[in-house]
Amino acid sequence: MINDIFNILLPHFVLGGFIILLLVLSMVLSPRLYRYARIIAVVGISASVVCLSTVQTDPQYFGFRNSIMSDSYTLLFDFMILCCGFLVALLSKNLVKRHKRNAFTYFAILLTAIFGAINIVSANDFLTLLVSIELLGFSTYFLISVSKGYHSKEAAFKYLITSAVSTGIFLFGVSYLYGITGSLNFTTIYEYITQNETSLIYTISAIMIILGLASKLAVFPFANWVIDVYKGTETSVLAYLSTIPKLAMFGIICRLMVFPLSNSFEIVFVIAVLSLLTALWANTYAIREKNVKVILACSSSANASYALLTASLVSVYNLSTVIFYLICYVIMNIGVFAYLNMYGDEKSFDINAFKGIYHKNHGHTALYTILIIGLAGIPITSGFIAKIYLFTAIANSGLVFVPFLLGLLLLMVLALFYYLKILMPLFYECDKNTDAEKFNTNFSQKFVVGVSAIITVLLGVCPEMLIELCRFIAYNI
């Protein structure tokens, strides 16, 4: 038991300790000391990152009766989740300043969400996975509802309902799989599947499990919630929502597609159809939208669909491509929401409200432009390299997937229109009488936007080292 704690769970225990500390302080400290909440959260996440060095990864380590595991794959995803959590905590300065009474509670919930996310990636049975998903889901629900406005409460309620339905579908799939194999452990299920012929009920259960998990990625037909949630949520929470849950869900989906869910054509074909439908819905919806948050919600859904299709086509090359794509995506996304955090949550997010902002905020808007063109997949950014590798992986997976590839390519070209729609108003109205205001920024916002933009360009120019690391991790999963 002690070996399990030090070989796998020390980062989890450290994070859990800081969660308890924040909850205790929320009851005993005055709201006037709200500034210390962010400091404690940042220290807790940093300590957890340091403790990752104690995690055993070679060979794979299984603990607590094989219910959790660690390897280089889980270590990378844990590191990415914790880094995103660190940046989200930095961006939450203005939010907790407006909600001083709930500052300690807010950061306790944020750390709980991170705790749930890293447990999802480490899970090696469906019971541990379910508890971790619910921990992440309920924490996300409270983070969405942190604002006092009507739209925030509506967004949280819609997320809760969608999450409940998707969890039900996931549980049905797990129950069918348990009925077939007699186990909830990934390793045992994988051994059973490889030694026996798969049946129709197995295929149905696998599709239900993947669909239940993919709903958190806003995949069709559970995609509509993302519109209302993004529209009614604070930008610092959106920086969390667009990164940490997605990393956690892709982390476990990729592992499940390797084992215990064998790579059957029926499962992959259904995922391919859902991915294409998601991309079609997201890109066509975004074209007619004028709210920047909604456009980014659709962008998030579309980008997730590209990665989901590639993740289902199991191979070392494809898996490494998905990992590289996710790293590039979360860096760009968190930078974009850091810029919107500079802009201010109390302002209108209609694209026309951004007119002329470049002329009052040259440097910040230039960095924001780099991040948006990265999301669009334009050259000299990591987004371009990531999408090239992603679509190459799909093309190499067989002729049957070429129509899906062509469809996704056409939709990606279509997506350029709404990315340009975000950028063009920024450079309008060059006269000095423009209504645009100079941002009142803090160091945390500048740091996140600057670092995100720099990494986006660096990975676009020289991605080789990161790609090699991703291939090494994919090979050793």
Language model feature labels by segment:
Residues 1-477:
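Alpha-helical transmembrane segments of multi-pass membrane proteins predominantly involved
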